[in-house]
Protein backbone atom coordinates (compact mmCIF):
# COMPACT_ATOMS: atom_id res chain seq x y z
CA UNK A 1 0.00 0.00 0.00
CA UNK A 2 1.31 3.45 -0.89
CA UNK A 3 2.52 5.72 1.88
CA UNK A 4 -0.32 8.20 1.40
CA UNK A 5 -2.85 5.37 1.80
CA UNK A 6 -1.38 4.63 5.22
CA UNK A 7 -1.56 8.33 6.11
CA UNK A 8 -5.22 8.57 5.13
CA UNK A 9 -6.03 5.39 7.06
CA UNK A 10 -4.35 6.69 10.22
CA UNK A 11 -6.17 10.04 9.99
CA UNK A 12 -9.53 8.27 9.55
CA UNK A 13 -8.86 6.03 12.55
CA UNK A 14 -7.77 9.02 14.67
CA UNK A 15 -10.93 10.93 13.82
CA UNK A 16 -13.16 7.88 14.26
CA UNK A 17 -12.01 7.18 17.82
CA UNK A 18 -13.69 10.26 19.41
CA UNK A 19 -16.91 9.61 17.47
CA UNK A 20 -17.08 6.03 18.76
CA UNK A 21 -16.31 7.15 22.31
CA UNK A 22 -18.97 9.83 22.03
CA UNK A 23 -21.61 7.30 21.05
CA UNK A 24 -20.58 5.05 23.94
CA UNK A 25 -20.38 7.75 26.62
CA UNK A 26 -22.89 10.41 25.61
CA UNK A 27 -24.81 11.83 28.54
CA UNK A 28 -26.64 15.05 29.27
CA UNK A 29 -24.06 17.00 31.26
CA UNK A 30 -26.25 20.01 31.88
CA UNK A 31 -26.72 20.97 35.51
CA UNK A 32 -30.12 20.24 37.02
CA UNK A 33 -31.90 23.28 38.43
CA UNK A 34 -31.14 22.09 41.97
CA UNK A 35 -27.39 22.50 41.29
CA UNK A 36 -27.32 26.07 40.03
CA UNK A 37 -26.51 27.52 43.46
CA UNK A 38 -23.70 25.09 44.19
CA UNK A 39 -20.05 26.17 44.13
CA UNK A 40 -18.56 26.49 40.68
CA UNK A 41 -16.01 23.82 39.78
CA UNK A 42 -12.88 24.24 37.69
CA UNK A 43 -10.53 21.58 36.35
CA UNK A 44 -6.90 22.77 36.21
CA UNK A 45 -4.94 20.48 33.90
CA UNK A 46 -1.24 20.31 33.10
CA UNK A 47 0.42 17.31 31.45
CA UNK A 48 3.51 17.83 33.58
CA UNK A 49 4.88 17.73 37.12
CA UNK A 50 2.43 19.64 39.32
CA UNK A 51 5.08 20.73 41.78
CA UNK A 52 7.14 22.23 38.94
CA UNK A 53 4.17 24.04 37.36
CA UNK A 54 3.97 27.13 39.60
CA UNK A 55 1.69 29.22 37.38
CA UNK A 56 -0.96 26.48 37.32
CA UNK A 57 -0.65 26.05 41.09
CA UNK A 58 -1.19 29.78 41.49
CA UNK A 59 -4.30 29.56 39.30
CA UNK A 60 -5.63 26.72 41.47
CA UNK A 61 -4.94 28.66 44.66
CA UNK A 62 -6.61 31.82 43.33
CA UNK A 63 -9.68 29.91 42.18
CA UNK A 64 -10.03 28.14 45.53
CA UNK A 65 -9.58 31.40 47.44
CA UNK A 66 -12.44 32.79 45.36
CA UNK A 67 -14.74 29.89 46.28
CA UNK A 68 -14.34 27.52 43.33
CA UNK A 69 -13.91 23.80 43.82
CA UNK A 70 -10.74 22.82 41.97
CA UNK A 71 -9.76 19.48 40.43
CA UNK A 72 -6.00 19.83 39.97
CA UNK A 73 -4.62 17.31 37.47
CA UNK A 74 -1.00 16.51 36.59
CA UNK A 75 1.97 14.25 37.23
CA UNK A 76 3.13 13.40 40.72
CA UNK A 77 6.64 14.67 41.36
CA UNK A 78 7.90 17.70 43.25
CA UNK A 79 5.78 18.61 46.25
CA UNK A 80 3.37 21.56 45.73
CA UNK A 81 3.26 24.22 48.44
CA UNK A 82 1.19 23.58 51.57
CA UNK A 83 -1.67 25.91 50.67
CA UNK A 84 -2.43 23.62 47.74
CA UNK A 85 -2.05 20.38 49.71
CA UNK A 86 -4.08 21.55 52.71
CA UNK A 87 -6.94 23.30 50.89
CA UNK A 88 -10.27 21.48 51.25
CA UNK A 89 -11.51 22.98 47.96
CA UNK A 90 -8.59 21.56 45.95
CA UNK A 91 -8.56 17.88 45.02
CA UNK A 92 -5.43 16.54 43.33
CA UNK A 93 -5.71 13.89 40.60
CA UNK A 94 -2.36 12.41 39.59
CA UNK A 95 -1.91 11.33 35.98
CA UNK A 96 0.27 8.20 35.75
CA UNK A 97 3.72 8.91 34.33
CA UNK A 98 4.55 6.72 31.32
CA UNK A 99 8.14 5.46 31.38
CA UNK A 100 10.07 3.43 28.81
CA UNK A 101 10.75 0.56 31.19
CA UNK A 102 10.91 -1.98 28.33
CA UNK A 103 13.64 0.00 26.53
CA UNK A 104 11.61 0.24 23.32
CA UNK A 105 12.97 2.18 20.34
CA UNK A 106 12.32 5.92 20.60
CA UNK A 107 9.76 6.08 17.78
CA UNK A 108 7.86 2.99 18.96
CA UNK A 109 7.76 4.21 22.55
CA UNK A 110 6.69 7.68 21.43
CA UNK A 111 3.69 6.33 19.51
CA UNK A 112 2.63 4.02 22.34
CA UNK A 113 3.08 6.82 24.88
CA UNK A 114 0.80 9.21 22.98
CA UNK A 115 -1.87 6.51 22.58
CA UNK A 116 -1.70 5.74 26.30
CA UNK A 117 -1.84 9.46 27.19
CA UNK A 118 -5.00 9.84 25.08
CA UNK A 119 -6.68 7.10 27.07
CA UNK A 120 -5.52 8.37 30.47
CA UNK A 121 -6.65 11.94 29.78
CA UNK A 122 -10.01 10.96 28.30
CA UNK A 123 -10.68 8.62 31.24
CA UNK A 124 -9.80 11.32 33.78
CA UNK A 125 -11.81 14.06 32.09
CA UNK A 126 -14.79 11.73 31.64
CA UNK A 127 -14.76 11.16 35.40
CA UNK A 128 -14.61 14.93 35.99
CA UNK A 129 -17.12 15.93 33.28
CA UNK A 130 -19.67 18.63 34.04
CA UNK A 131 -17.18 21.19 35.38
CA UNK A 132 -17.93 24.85 34.83
CA UNK A 133 -14.43 25.57 33.54
CA UNK A 134 -11.41 23.65 32.27
CA UNK A 135 -8.13 25.58 32.57
CA UNK A 136 -5.34 23.94 30.56
CA UNK A 137 -1.63 24.66 30.26
CA UNK A 138 -0.08 24.71 26.80
CA UNK A 139 2.49 23.35 26.02
CA UNK A 140 2.59 20.38 26.03
CA UNK A 141 0.19 20.48 23.09
CA UNK A 142 0.08 16.81 22.00
CA UNK A 143 -2.13 15.07 22.97
CA UNK A 144 -3.58 17.57 25.48
CA UNK A 145 -5.27 19.99 23.10
CA UNK A 146 -6.92 17.30 20.98
CA UNK A 147 -8.27 15.48 24.03
CA UNK A 148 -9.55 18.73 25.54
CA UNK A 149 -11.36 19.57 22.31
CA UNK A 150 -12.97 16.10 22.27
CA UNK A 151 -13.99 16.51 25.93
CA UNK A 152 -15.61 19.86 25.23
CA UNK A 153 -17.43 18.69 22.10
CA UNK A 154 -18.69 15.33 23.32
CA UNK A 155 -18.32 14.77 27.07
CA UNK A 156 -18.97 18.16 28.68
CA UNK A 157 -20.37 20.73 26.25
CA UNK A 158 -21.27 23.21 29.00
CA UNK A 159 -17.67 23.50 30.20
CA UNK A 160 -15.83 26.67 29.19
CA UNK A 161 -12.26 25.89 28.13
CA UNK A 162 -9.55 28.40 29.06
CA UNK A 163 -6.11 27.78 27.55
CA UNK A 164 -3.09 29.26 29.31
CA UNK A 165 -0.36 29.64 26.70
CA UNK A 166 3.11 29.56 28.29
CA UNK A 167 4.86 29.11 24.94
CA UNK A 168 4.27 27.49 21.55
CA UNK A 169 4.77 23.72 21.61
CA UNK A 170 5.92 23.48 18.00
CA UNK A 171 8.77 25.94 18.64
CA UNK A 172 10.09 23.71 21.43
CA UNK A 173 10.06 20.75 19.03
CA UNK A 174 11.92 22.94 16.53
CA UNK A 175 14.84 23.11 18.98
CA UNK A 176 15.50 19.45 18.12
CA UNK A 177 14.27 19.29 14.52
CA UNK A 178 14.42 21.71 11.55
CA UNK A 179 11.40 24.00 11.20
CA UNK A 180 10.70 22.37 7.83
CA UNK A 181 10.51 18.87 9.34
CA UNK A 182 7.08 17.21 8.84
CA UNK A 183 6.72 16.62 12.60
CA UNK A 184 7.23 20.33 13.34
CA UNK A 185 4.73 21.30 10.64
CA UNK A 186 2.20 18.80 12.01
CA UNK A 187 2.74 20.05 15.58
CA UNK A 188 2.12 23.63 14.44
CA UNK A 189 -1.08 22.64 12.61
CA UNK A 190 -2.26 20.56 15.59
CA UNK A 191 -1.63 23.39 18.04
CA UNK A 192 -3.50 25.95 15.97
CA UNK A 193 -6.38 23.68 14.96
CA UNK A 194 -7.21 22.26 18.39
CA UNK A 195 -5.98 25.20 20.46
CA UNK A 196 -7.82 27.91 18.60
CA UNK A 197 -11.33 26.92 19.74
CA UNK A 198 -11.09 27.83 23.42
CA UNK A 199 -13.48 30.16 25.24
CA UNK A 200 -10.56 32.38 26.28
CA UNK A 201 -6.81 32.32 25.70
CA UNK A 202 -4.50 33.54 28.45
CA UNK A 203 -0.91 34.23 27.44
CA UNK A 204 2.21 35.27 29.31
CA UNK A 205 3.11 38.33 27.20
CA UNK A 206 1.45 40.90 24.98
CA UNK A 207 3.87 39.91 22.20
CA UNK A 208 2.68 36.30 22.44
CA UNK A 209 -0.92 37.44 22.08
CA UNK A 210 -0.01 39.29 18.90
CA UNK A 211 1.79 36.20 17.59
CA UNK A 212 -1.25 34.01 18.33
CA UNK A 213 -3.35 36.26 16.12
CA UNK A 214 -0.78 36.26 13.34
CA UNK A 215 0.28 32.60 13.49
CA UNK A 216 -3.04 30.89 14.26
CA UNK A 217 -5.57 33.51 13.16
CA UNK A 218 -7.14 33.75 16.62
CA UNK A 219 -9.59 36.48 17.53
CA UNK A 220 -8.05 39.28 19.58
CA UNK A 221 -11.27 39.54 21.59
CA UNK A 222 -10.50 36.17 23.19
CA UNK A 223 -6.85 36.80 24.06
CA UNK A 224 -5.99 38.08 27.55
CA UNK A 225 -2.32 38.68 28.44
CA UNK A 226 -1.55 37.71 32.04
CA UNK A 227 2.02 38.49 32.99
CA UNK A 228 3.53 36.20 35.59
CA UNK A 229 3.76 37.88 38.96
CA UNK A 230 5.37 36.69 42.20
CA UNK A 231 3.17 34.59 44.46
CA UNK A 232 2.72 35.22 48.16
CA UNK A 233 5.73 33.19 49.33
CA UNK A 234 8.24 35.21 47.24
CA UNK A 235 9.03 38.33 49.25
CA UNK A 236 12.09 40.38 50.27
CA UNK A 237 13.97 39.21 53.36
CA UNK A 238 15.07 41.35 56.27
CA UNK A 239 18.77 41.42 57.17
CA UNK A 240 18.15 39.05 60.09
CA UNK A 241 16.25 36.64 57.81
CA UNK A 242 19.17 36.68 55.36
CA UNK A 243 21.55 35.76 58.18
CA UNK A 244 19.24 32.88 59.10
CA UNK A 245 19.46 31.56 55.52
CA UNK A 246 23.25 31.80 55.49
CA UNK A 247 23.37 29.91 58.78
CA UNK A 248 20.84 27.22 57.78
CA UNK A 249 22.71 26.39 54.55
CA UNK A 250 26.23 27.09 55.76
CA UNK A 251 27.44 23.51 55.31
CA UNK A 252 26.16 23.08 51.76
CA UNK A 253 25.83 26.38 49.89
CA UNK A 254 27.64 29.07 51.86
CA UNK A 255 30.70 27.21 53.15
CA UNK A 256 34.03 29.09 53.32
CA UNK A 257 32.39 32.45 52.67
CA UNK A 258 33.53 35.81 54.01
CA UNK A 259 31.66 39.09 54.48
CA UNK A 260 33.19 40.34 51.21
CA UNK A 261 31.46 37.70 49.09
CA UNK A 262 28.63 38.69 46.75
CA UNK A 263 25.98 36.07 46.07
CA UNK A 264 24.59 35.39 42.60
CA UNK A 265 21.72 32.94 42.18
CA UNK A 266 20.38 31.31 39.03
CA UNK A 267 17.76 28.64 38.45
CA UNK A 268 17.93 26.28 35.49
CA UNK A 269 16.31 23.14 34.14
CA UNK A 270 19.53 22.24 32.27
CA UNK A 271 17.79 22.09 28.90
CA UNK A 272 18.79 23.37 25.41
CA UNK A 273 16.80 26.62 25.75
CA UNK A 274 19.17 27.74 28.54
CA UNK A 275 22.77 28.22 27.43
CA UNK A 276 24.78 27.89 30.63
CA UNK A 277 28.00 28.44 28.66
CA UNK A 278 27.10 32.15 28.65
CA UNK A 279 27.19 32.25 32.45
CA UNK A 280 30.33 30.15 32.79
CA UNK A 281 32.22 32.22 30.21
CA UNK A 282 31.03 35.43 31.89
CA UNK A 283 32.25 34.19 35.28
CA UNK A 284 35.60 33.29 33.70
CA UNK A 285 35.95 36.88 32.43
CA UNK A 286 35.11 38.18 35.92
CA UNK A 287 37.67 35.82 37.45
CA UNK A 288 40.41 36.95 35.03
CA UNK A 289 39.72 40.69 35.49
CA UNK A 290 42.48 42.83 36.98
CA UNK A 291 39.90 45.09 38.67
CA UNK A 292 39.54 45.08 42.46
CA UNK A 293 36.37 42.96 42.56
CA UNK A 294 34.71 41.06 45.42
CA UNK A 295 34.70 37.24 45.38
CA UNK A 296 31.51 35.62 44.11
CA UNK A 297 29.49 32.69 45.41
CA UNK A 298 27.22 31.45 42.59
CA UNK A 299 24.26 29.25 43.58
CA UNK A 300 22.68 27.25 40.75
CA UNK A 301 19.36 25.61 41.62
CA UNK A 302 17.42 23.04 39.61
CA UNK A 303 17.99 19.75 37.86
CA UNK A 304 17.71 18.41 34.34
CA UNK A 305 19.22 16.26 31.57
CA UNK A 306 22.27 18.44 30.85
CA UNK A 307 23.38 18.84 34.47
CA UNK A 308 26.35 16.38 34.20
CA UNK A 309 27.69 18.37 31.23
CA UNK A 310 27.40 21.60 33.24
CA UNK A 311 29.23 20.16 36.25
CA UNK A 312 32.03 18.84 34.03
CA UNK A 313 32.56 22.32 32.56
CA UNK A 314 32.60 23.91 36.02
CA UNK A 315 35.29 21.45 37.08
CA UNK A 316 37.51 22.41 34.14
CA UNK A 317 37.30 26.16 34.81
CA UNK A 318 39.26 26.13 38.10
CA UNK A 319 38.13 29.64 39.03
CA UNK A 320 39.95 31.48 41.81
CA UNK A 321 37.60 34.19 43.09
CA UNK A 322 34.37 32.60 41.87
CA UNK A 323 32.95 29.51 43.55
CA UNK A 324 29.90 27.62 42.25
CA UNK A 325 27.46 25.45 44.21
CA UNK A 326 24.48 23.50 42.86
CA UNK A 327 21.33 22.46 44.72
CA UNK A 328 17.87 20.97 44.24
CA UNK A 329 15.72 22.80 46.78
CA UNK A 330 12.45 22.12 48.53
CA UNK A 331 9.63 24.46 47.53
CA UNK A 332 9.78 26.35 50.84
CA UNK A 333 13.57 26.84 50.66
CA UNK A 334 13.77 28.26 47.13
CA UNK A 335 12.37 31.74 47.99
CA UNK A 336 14.74 31.99 50.95
CA UNK A 337 17.80 31.24 48.81
CA UNK A 338 16.67 33.85 46.28
CA UNK A 339 16.05 36.45 48.97
CA UNK A 340 19.57 36.07 50.38
CA UNK A 341 21.25 36.85 47.03
CA UNK A 342 22.61 40.16 45.77
CA UNK A 343 21.86 39.44 42.10
CA UNK A 344 19.85 36.97 40.03
CA UNK A 345 20.74 35.57 36.60
CA UNK A 346 18.42 34.19 33.93
CA UNK A 347 19.84 32.14 31.05
CA UNK A 348 16.45 31.48 29.46
CA UNK A 349 16.48 31.81 25.67
CA UNK A 350 12.89 31.49 24.54
CA UNK A 351 12.23 28.96 21.76
CA UNK A 352 9.54 31.28 20.41
CA UNK A 353 10.81 34.65 21.64
CA UNK A 354 7.38 35.31 23.16
CA UNK A 355 7.41 33.80 26.66
CA UNK A 356 9.03 35.12 29.82
CA UNK A 357 11.19 33.31 32.39
CA UNK A 358 9.24 32.55 35.57
CA UNK A 359 12.51 32.56 37.51
CA UNK A 360 12.90 36.31 36.88
CA UNK A 361 9.42 36.91 38.30
CA UNK A 362 10.38 34.90 41.40
CA UNK A 363 13.58 36.91 41.80
CA UNK A 364 11.72 40.20 41.51
CA UNK A 365 9.27 38.90 44.10
CA UNK A 366 12.20 38.54 46.49
CA UNK A 367 13.40 42.03 45.61
CA UNK A 368 16.62 41.05 43.84
CA UNK A 369 17.64 42.61 40.50
CA UNK A 370 18.31 40.37 37.51
CA UNK A 371 20.82 40.06 34.70
CA UNK A 372 19.07 38.23 31.87
CA UNK A 373 19.89 37.01 28.38
CA UNK A 374 17.97 39.30 26.03
CA UNK A 375 15.30 38.32 23.48
CA UNK A 376 12.16 39.78 21.90
CA UNK A 377 9.63 39.75 24.77
CA UNK A 378 12.03 40.28 27.67
CA UNK A 379 11.50 44.05 27.75
CA UNK A 380 7.95 43.42 29.03
CA UNK A 381 9.59 42.28 32.28
CA UNK A 382 13.24 43.34 32.59
CA UNK A 383 13.90 47.08 32.21
CA UNK A 384 17.62 47.69 31.73
CA UNK A 385 19.12 49.96 34.41
CA UNK A 386 15.74 50.08 36.18
CA UNK A 387 15.17 46.61 37.69
CA UNK A 388 17.93 44.66 35.97
CA UNK A 389 20.09 44.43 32.87
CA UNK A 390 19.41 42.62 29.57
CA UNK A 391 22.57 41.30 27.91
CA UNK A 392 23.57 39.64 24.67
CA UNK A 393 26.33 37.08 25.09
CA UNK A 394 28.91 36.26 27.72
CA UNK A 395 31.06 39.37 27.22
CA UNK A 396 28.17 41.72 28.06
CA UNK A 397 27.20 39.54 31.01
CA UNK A 398 30.75 39.46 32.36
CA UNK A 399 31.16 43.22 31.94
CA UNK A 400 27.81 43.75 33.68
CA UNK A 401 28.94 41.69 36.69
CA UNK A 402 32.13 43.76 36.90
CA UNK A 403 30.25 47.04 36.57
CA UNK A 404 27.61 46.22 39.19
CA UNK A 405 30.02 44.83 41.78
CA UNK A 406 32.58 47.62 41.36
CA UNK A 407 29.99 50.41 41.49
CA UNK A 408 27.60 50.04 44.40
CA UNK A 409 25.42 52.89 43.13
CA UNK A 410 24.49 50.96 39.98
CA UNK A 411 23.58 47.83 41.93
CA UNK A 412 21.58 49.83 44.48
CA UNK A 413 19.65 51.55 41.67
CA UNK A 414 18.40 48.35 40.04
CA UNK A 415 17.83 46.89 43.51
CA UNK A 416 15.31 49.68 44.14
CA UNK A 417 13.55 48.81 40.89
CA UNK A 418 13.36 45.14 41.87
CA UNK A 419 11.88 46.08 45.24
CA UNK A 420 9.16 48.05 43.44
CA UNK A 421 8.44 44.96 41.30
CA UNK A 422 8.03 42.87 44.47
CA UNK A 423 4.93 44.88 45.42
CA UNK A 424 3.05 43.93 42.24
CA UNK A 425 1.78 40.50 43.26
CA UNK A 426 0.03 37.61 41.52
CA UNK A 427 -3.10 37.96 43.65
CA UNK A 428 -3.62 41.60 42.68
CA UNK A 429 -3.07 40.95 38.97
CA UNK A 430 -5.14 37.75 38.85
CA UNK A 431 -8.24 39.19 40.53
CA UNK A 432 -8.32 42.16 38.14
CA UNK A 433 -7.41 40.38 34.91
CA UNK A 434 -8.55 36.76 35.16
CA UNK A 435 -11.13 36.63 37.95
CA UNK A 436 -14.01 38.02 35.85
CA UNK A 437 -13.46 35.29 33.23
CA UNK A 438 -14.42 32.78 35.94
CA UNK A 439 -17.36 34.89 37.19
CA UNK A 440 -15.23 36.23 40.04
CA UNK A 441 -15.37 39.98 40.68
CA UNK A 442 -15.99 42.57 38.00
CA UNK A 443 -14.04 43.85 35.03
CA UNK A 444 -11.97 46.87 36.03
CA UNK A 445 -9.89 47.31 32.89
CA UNK A 446 -10.38 47.92 29.21
CA UNK A 447 -11.33 45.10 26.90
CA UNK A 448 -8.19 43.15 25.94
CA UNK A 449 -8.57 44.00 22.26
CA UNK A 450 -8.63 47.73 23.05
CA UNK A 451 -5.97 47.65 25.74
CA UNK A 452 -3.45 45.63 23.75
CA UNK A 453 -4.50 46.37 20.15
CA UNK A 454 -5.68 42.81 19.57
CA UNK A 455 -8.83 43.83 17.70
CA UNK A 456 -9.85 41.47 14.94
CA UNK A 457 -12.53 41.42 12.31
CA UNK A 458 -12.78 37.62 12.40
CA UNK A 459 -15.93 36.00 13.74
CA UNK A 460 -15.99 34.37 17.17
CA UNK A 461 -18.90 32.11 16.33
CA UNK A 462 -16.73 29.07 15.62
CA UNK A 463 -14.89 29.44 18.93
Curated annotation (Swiss-Prot):
Intramembrane features from the record: 106-126
Gene Ontology CC terms: cytoplasmic side of endoplasmic reticulum membrane; endoplasmic reticulum
Regions crossing the membrane: 4-24
Subcellular location: Endoplasmic reticulum membrane
Keywords: Endoplasmic reticulum, Glycosyltransferase, Membrane, Transferase, Transmembrane, Transmembrane helix
Primary location: endoplasmic reticulum
Xref: PANTHER family: BETA1,4 MANNOSYLTRANSFERASE, CHITOBIOSYLDIPHOSPHODOLICHOL BETA-MANNOSYLTRANSFERASE
Family named by the database record: Belongs to the glycosyltransferase group 1 family.
Protein name as catalogued: Chitobiosyldiphosphodolichol beta-mannosyltransferase
Amino acid sequence: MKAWHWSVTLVVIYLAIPVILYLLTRKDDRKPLSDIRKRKRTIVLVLGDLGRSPRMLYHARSLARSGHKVDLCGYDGAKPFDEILNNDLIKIHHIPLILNTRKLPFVVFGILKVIRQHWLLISLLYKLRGADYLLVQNPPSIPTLGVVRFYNLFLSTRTKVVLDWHNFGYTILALKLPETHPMVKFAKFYEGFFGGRAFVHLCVTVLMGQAMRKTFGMSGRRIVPLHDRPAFHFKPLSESEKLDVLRDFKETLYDDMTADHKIIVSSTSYTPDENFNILLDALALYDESKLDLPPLRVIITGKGPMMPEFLAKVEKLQLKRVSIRTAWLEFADYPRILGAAHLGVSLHESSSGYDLPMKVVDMFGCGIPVVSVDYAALSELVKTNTNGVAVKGHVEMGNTFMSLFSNRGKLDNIKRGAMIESRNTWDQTWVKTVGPLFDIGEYVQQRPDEDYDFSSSSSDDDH
